[in-house]
Amino acid sequence: MPREKKKRGRRAEKSQSKRKREDEEGSDSPKRQRTTNEDNDVQAGDDYIPLVTHDTEKEQEQGQEDDTPFYGLLDTEEQEYFSKASQTLELNSFEDDDDKRLFIESVYTEAKGKELKIACSQSCSRLMEKLIAMSTPDQVKALFEKFSGHFLHLVQHRFASHCCECLFIRAAPIVTSEMEKPKDKKKDRKQTTETNGEDGEQDEPMNQKPAMDLFLGVVSELEGNWGYLLTESFASHTIRVLLLILAGEPLADHSNARVLASRKKENVDSITSTAQAELTIRESRQVPAEFNSTLRKMISDLSAGLNSTYLQALATHPIGSPVLQVILSIELGCMGKEKVKDKSSVFRRLVPDDTLETKEEGVNFLNSLFYDPVGSRLLETIVRVAPGKFFKTFYKTIIRERIGSLARNEIASYVVIKVLERVSREDLQSAIESILPEIPSLVQRSRLNVIKTIIDRSTVRSADTTSLAKALESAYGEDGLVRLKTILGVEATDKDAESVKPKAATSAQHLHGSLLAQAMLQAPGRLATMIQTSFLAAPVEILIQIAKNSTASRALQEALKPSKSNTQFRRQLLPQFYGQMCDLSLDSSGSHVADALWDATSDLVFIKQRLAQELVDNESALRDSFLGRAVWRNWSMDLYKRKRGEWMSRAKGLDNPRVSAPTADSSAEPAKSKLDLARARYAARAEQQEKPDSREQGPRGKKQALSAPSGLLKAQ
């Protein structure tokens, strides 16, 4: 008799037990089930941390995924259209502004009702950023209203968060413009309503909310979720932008640029933004009073649920620390001294008032930030914007005795740079003496940022740099040629030398060396002489090699800048370029050196004539090259060939708009300041008012009173 087919082994037993469990689920078990309250019978103290199991973590993740809305996907035809529109905007090959405006309006018409889809699309979100950067204020506000109600989800989206940042940055100047001209806008609205009549489509922009209300709506929409948005990888960037906008701080400032976006982010604004738009985001803006109150409430809500321990842990968090930097810069720089003294402020919760003097927890916290790659950036922010009283205590208690060892460290040296930029002349001089023993090791490891900062600040503070020059001379050697090669990194030109070190590391070292050489050339005295003697000791081949190097040529251009103190140096160096003008003019980096030779020979006309003759001899080669034509134009060689007399006057600085405009007009009257112009207008107005009443009034009447400012002008 055939047997029944059965599975053998553990798999069969497992399936049978699974069926039994499924059958038993329907029947009520007589055993009492444990409730959730009984799991947490333990009394929670201050140090109690609840146990989060894997099941609860999965449930939370599943809940977050379910809460995230799905706005839909674009069709294939829509994706093709928007990708072509993105390419068109990037090329920016429009005939005029009207053509560009009509194209943007057509794209907005096609995108109507699909704005959220485009913002969340991987391929089309960049189009949305470009559109926002090129849009008019009405279009920006209309798109702002389309996003309203969805910002909590959009700021956490990988692609839509970038669109939100771009939208906030573009809408920030609109708030200021609406504050400055509210009356004119009312008149414009009346005129437009009269002309448009009862057309609903034309009246739609007139019903828009003010930009201030739109921003306040974003804050209220995100309110209550600051805790997890603070450390969310995408939303944290948007929070930083929002904080700076509410505070009226510059959005493209050098100090704020690194906390707004990462280095990997594509700079779409550089392609689409205009000069006026760049100017508006680089300047501080006037913000309404509602922004100030909202900003204070937002910062208090951000830090309300965070104790001092969590705040100190947030200082080294790679995502939360930049937000903390923005909060500290706003608290210490915008909210005044009262906020700094407030014990509930973020700054005082991180560093209590008396901890630096008693050497308690605050000092340990600050010491831990020096060597942390993330925390050191927060410490740089504290050093940059902290009140003067706190900075002096911080410098005397923590920095002064160990500034040499801190300057030697790769991470802590950046904090030392910020400290050196703020200390007084006496403290700078003592800091130089403390760092001098570390100069050889800094030079050996190519960590030249601290040395460059010392030279720059010594030039500003008029500090003595003789001891620093001796230390650098002993570290680099007395041979000028070897010193120049080491600083600028021109000795590593062979293939074997280039294969020893990574390309990125060597390029960074060469950049720091070039910046150090430029700083030494700008400093008076022995430091500048060190670089000048090194250039004079270099043969022609090395000079041409330096001129053709994109990094090292900057130092050569700085050395060629004319001044009264380096006339003898230029007289000796410039003949080294005889016979090299054509070679330099045809090189991308050397062409800049060729342009610098025009200014370098402003008081050495006989050298300029010889260099110009070399350009004439190689005219055909120069005209065949784009770089050569630029050098030919900058040297005014057409004028040299046709009107030699006019070229000579321009070469001497008598008719050169680039160089001699200030010197040519030196005999004329200096430009009047705004105060002088205002005084002149006041005096002219006074003379006009006094003419009809001069017969009726006496010597002490209106005429004498009004003529007093003109008398003051003559006295001045």
From Swiss-Prot:
Tagged with keyword Chaperone: no
InterPro entries from the UniProt entry: ARM-like (IPR011989), ARM-type_fold (IPR016024), NOP9 (IPR040000), Pumilio_RNA-bd_rpt (IPR001313)
PROSITE patterns for the chain: PUM (PS50302)
GO BP terms: endonucleolytic cleavage in 5'-ETS of tricistronic rRNA transcript (SSU-rRNA, 5.8S rRNA, LSU-rRNA); endonucleolytic cleavage in ITS1 to separate SSU-rRNA from 5.8S rRNA and LSU-rRNA from tricistronic rRNA transcript (SSU-rRNA, 5.8S rRNA, LSU-rRNA); endonucleolytic cleavage to generate mature 5'-end of SSU-rRNA from (SSU-rRNA, 5.8S rRNA, LSU-rRNA); ribosomal small subunit export from nucleus
Listed Gene3D superfamilies: Leucine-rich Repeat Variant
Subcellular location, principal: nucleus
Pfam families named among the record's database cross-references: PUF_NOP9 (PF22493)
Chain residue ranges for the region called Disordered: 1-70, 179-207, 653-716
First and last residues of every Pumilio repeat: 110-145, 146-181, 305-342, 361-396, 397-433, 534-575, 576-613
Record-stated family: Belongs to the NOP9 family.
Its job: RNA-binding nucleolar protein required for pre-rRNA processing. Involved in production of 18S rRNA and assembly of small ribosomal subunit.
Record PANTHER family: NUCLEOLAR PROTEIN 9
Name the record gives this protein: Nucleolar protein 9
Protein encoded by which gene: NOP9
